């Protein structure tokens, strides 16, 4: 049964058409994911459905007394309310009852012997029974706990941005609604909370419509995808994975149709140019048909960004941290941290919110001076730093002028030189948009522009602080492809599980109280291992033995030896690949003996390096065997 119908919605923003007479309906208990490039109007469509924005043409009808709850991307909570007062705000009978009960409980707590206040509490409890509000009360406390909101008496104006988002989510989940609309619900949430929210939404009693950049979340929560692109809305039954398959089919069909149109147009033009004899009416029909074919537009790709920008050469010394200590407000964030970053690494930094991940990232990039220890950055290192905050972007600059401040020309990975205008076009900023003022861009478009500006600096070490926030899934896919080809080092803080699985090969894990551990592998591998460790029971006999016997300090490799061991197999594979490539280059050199001599010298050097690496692998493996025996 449909709970909401939208017919022929039309809306523009400036000279851009956001919705070109789109129609759709939302069924009970549907889970809809709305996707599309930044700036296409996804958040606007959510607000239109929620009744928060108007449309120029079309109509939205709701069946009966359908209730809609809306989560803003950056919620602004009313000052003067506590967390609990905000959670229970609303005009439903249940919310009014909960407010009365909490007030009676609070007043009695101040004067427990007051008979009048005791009567008020008894009356409030009776009302809770009558309105079946106890379940809502339990749900509210559970949701707040799961979202990490513990102090319900705190004024909302004292909360951080992330805490406000959590409180807003809690309010939306608790309020009775037939349709729950969520705009980027996973922003500011840690991965454990996101996984809980996935499970909660799968059991939610109403329909859900959401915009999110988190592709795992999108895939696990939704059963229908709406794709908003260039004013049109395409619908797909299934989750994000099914959508990717079906969109590829749709684009292939559109390309076939365009090929047929082009062939027919060429045939008709050839006929007319030959001046073939025909009755004038028939000739006129051909001319009309040619004009019609010319006016038809071919399919436009869903968009492809080209991130193939060059980078500066990176030497062997990248970044080394020795006994780094960082404290904040009397709390230890980083305690005696040691790290050796080697060329080509892909490192993810993970941990709960507010634990110090961004602070460590800033320290490794030379932006924050640690309280103790040393951080050494190699002389050839050229840092590109993508931060969460792009508020320093001058809104009065035009798009093209902002990019030209970094570079007017940039070299691609292939060695070609392209202009700032061409680079912007590759980033889905057409010429017509390049004269737009930055203040007029959507949040996602600003992030994409900022990303381009960072990459145009041609870095060889890329620091990414929550890069997936506010970027559309399309841009994220291409950023991941860029990282695949990027020859330098990538160090990222991210809560995006898909992104971490896709780009990093080892993790720096914040455990709390300044303790930092490491994990070699993907984020999903790390989570599986963590869950297995928590689930594994500890044998009582072993625990008693461990208590009775004096603890023996376990021997292990030195820190630098362990780092070398972690990366040596990759190093051997790279040298083997290089040796094979040189062999092929020698064969292809033909009779160019000067070139052959040069290649053979390089091959001999590579063979020596490979042999030395193999010897070192043997040496380290023997050391490990001895330590484990």
Swiss-Prot record:
Residues 560-629 form a coiled coil. It comes from the Bacteria. Residues 295-304 have a biased composition (Polar residues). Belongs to the ABC transporter superfamily. PANTHER family: ABC TRANSPORTER ATP-BINDING SUBUNIT, ABC TRANSPORTER DOMAIN-CONTAINING PROTEIN. Its EC number is 7.-.-.-. Residues 4-255, 319-537 form the ABC transporter domain. It is an enzyme of class 7 (translocase). Transmembrane segments: none annotated. ATP binds at residues 36-43, 351-358. Residues 284-304, 530-555 are annotated as: Disordered. One of its GO terms (molecular function) is ATP binding. The gene is yfmR. It holds the Pfam family ABC_tran_CTD. SMART domains: AAA (SM00382). Keywords: ATP-binding, Coiled coil, Nucleotide-binding, Repeat, Translocase, Transport. This is Uncharacterized ABC transporter ATP-binding protein YfmR.
